[in-house]
C-alpha cells in the first residue's frame, strides 16, 4: 500500500532542495520577474497534477511570483511535453516530467515532438514512480 504522507514528505524535501538552488541563482539576476508556467502533460486530478499544485504553491511563495499549473494532456504526455519544447528557453516554462513520457515514449511512438536528451535540462527530482512491466 502506498503511504501518501511518505510520498508527500519526499516531495517537500525535494522541493526544498530545488528552491534553494533556484533562490541562489535568482539572487544573481532578476529572475523571476513574471509568472512561471509549470506544464503537466496529464489531465487534472491525478497524482502528477496534485504534486504540481503543491509544488507550484510552495515555489510561488518562495520565489515571490505566481506559478501557474497548466495541464496539457494527450498522447501519453507527448502533447504537453512538446509544447514545453516549443516554448522560449527562458526558464519561465517548466515541465513536470515523468519517466514514462521522457524515457519510454521515445521507444513506443514513431514520431514524438521532442528529444529527451537534447531538448531538456533537468532542474531537480521531485519523487519516484515505480513502474512494473509484466
Identify the residue ranges that each predicted region occupies.
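Hydrophobic/proline-rich hinge and linker segments of small-molecule sensing/allosteric domains
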Residues: 104, 110, 127-134
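Bacterial N-terminal signal peptides
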Residues: 9-20
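N-terminal (or domain-start) structured segment
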Residues: 26-118
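Well-ordered beta-strand positions enriched in small/hydrophobic/aromatic, beta-favoring residues
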Residues: 94-95, 123, 133
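Juxtamembrane cytosolic interface motif at the C-terminal end of transmembrane helices
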Residues: 21-25
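N-terminal secretory signal peptides that target proteins for export/translocation
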Residues: 1-6
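Short Pro/Gly-enriched coil loops immediately N-terminal to beta-strands
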Residues: 118, 123-130
Amino acid at each position: 500500500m502506498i503511504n501518501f504522507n511518505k510520498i508527500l514528505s519526499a516531495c517537500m524535501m525535494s522541493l526544498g532542495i530545488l528552491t534553494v538552488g533556484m533562490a541562489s541563482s535568482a539572487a544573481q539576476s532578476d529572475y523571476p520577474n513574471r509568472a512561471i508556467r509549470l506544464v503537466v502533460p496529464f489531465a487534472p486530478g491525478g497524482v502528477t497534477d496534485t504534486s504540481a499544485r503543491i509544488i507550484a504553491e510552495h515555489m510561488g511563495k518562495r520565489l515571490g511570483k505566481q506559478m501557474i499549473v497548466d495541464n496539457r494532456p494527450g498522447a501519453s504526455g507527448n502533447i504537453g511535453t512538446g509544447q514545453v519544447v516549443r516554448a522560449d528557453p527562458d526558464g519561465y516554462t517548466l515541465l513536470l516530467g515523468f519517466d514514462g513520457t521522457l524515457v519510454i515514449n521515445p521507444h513506443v511512438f514513431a514520431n514524438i515532438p521532442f528529444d529527451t536528451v537534447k531538448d531538456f535540462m533537468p532542474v531537480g527530482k521531485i519523487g519516484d514512480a515505480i513502474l512494473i512491466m509484466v
